[in-house]
Amino acid sequence: MGNIRETFFKKTCSEEIQLVLASASPRRLALLAQIGLDPHQVYATNIDETPKLREHPANLAKRLAKEKALKAQETFLWCNQNGKSNASAQKIVILAADTVVAVGRVILPKPESEDQAYECLRFLSGRSHKVYGAVCALNECGKITVKLVESRVRFRRLTSSLMEAYLNSGEWEGKAGGYAIQGKASAFVVHIAGSYSNVVGLPLAETMDLLTAYQYPLLSNWVAKTL
């Protein structure tokens, strides 16, 4: 793998830069589509997301975003080695992100059961919490950059019937903190400060800044289509 990695990172070309998304999240794909981006490749990264002892939520988000980018890099290299990708000479930008919901330093999980989701909602009820979003870019030269965004969200007080109805909707599944602000849980929010797209799953302004810094031609897609 070492020789492949060295060869891969030394190769450059004048061809189009490939955007590789290190996430299979439909929310992140939809957010990228909002700014005219359609990744060339998507890799679902499987990493251990367990927080380290006394790890700050912001540091957790940054660490996981970076680990996802590096994991996608390994997958990309493996596919190239085994003839499953013809992008060996391509310039690439791997984009990865992670979202962490926390009240103070208490990190809320992605619930694995209705009971866990209920505890998240009960904890968020009538309180403010922070959503830490980290976005990471990694290119074929090994250059890696991580940006962190903080958003503050305040929930209304949630009644038992409201929480039960939300749990029955199933919308909490796979969501950091057990809710999706772009869905039915939007009715829970009485105040938000900061990036809305960050709470959904990807801070778009910072993502655009990162891709621009990595010379990805994002704005080339912002052209009106004629019929």
Swiss-Prot record:
Family matches, as CDD domains: Maf (cd00555)
Cofactors required: a divalent metal cation
Marked site positions, Important for substrate specificity: 27, 99, 182
Residues at the active site: 98
SUPFAM superfamilies given in the database record: ITPase-like
Gene Ontology MF annotations: dTTP diphosphatase activity; UTP diphosphatase activity
Subcellular compartments: Cytoplasm
InterPro entries: ITPase-like_fam, Maf-like
Gene Ontology annotations for the cellular component aspect, listed alphabetically: cytoplasm
Catalytic activity entry: dTTP + H2O = dTMP + diphosphate + H(+); UTP + H2O = UMP + diphosphate + H(+)
GO biological process annotation, one example: nucleotide metabolic process
Classification via Pfam families: Maf
Keyword check for Cytoplasm: yes
Entry EC number(s): 3.6.1.9
Keywords associated with the record: Cytoplasm, Hydrolase, Nucleotide metabolism
Similarity remark: Belongs to the Maf family. YhdE subfamily.
UniProt xrefs under HAMAP family: Maf
Role description: Nucleoside triphosphate pyrophosphatase that hydrolyzes dTTP and UTP. May have a dual role in cell division arrest and in preventing the incorporation of modified nucleotides into cellular nucleic acids.
Protein name per UniProt: dTTP/UTP pyrophosphatase
Organism: Bartonella quintana (strain Toulouse)
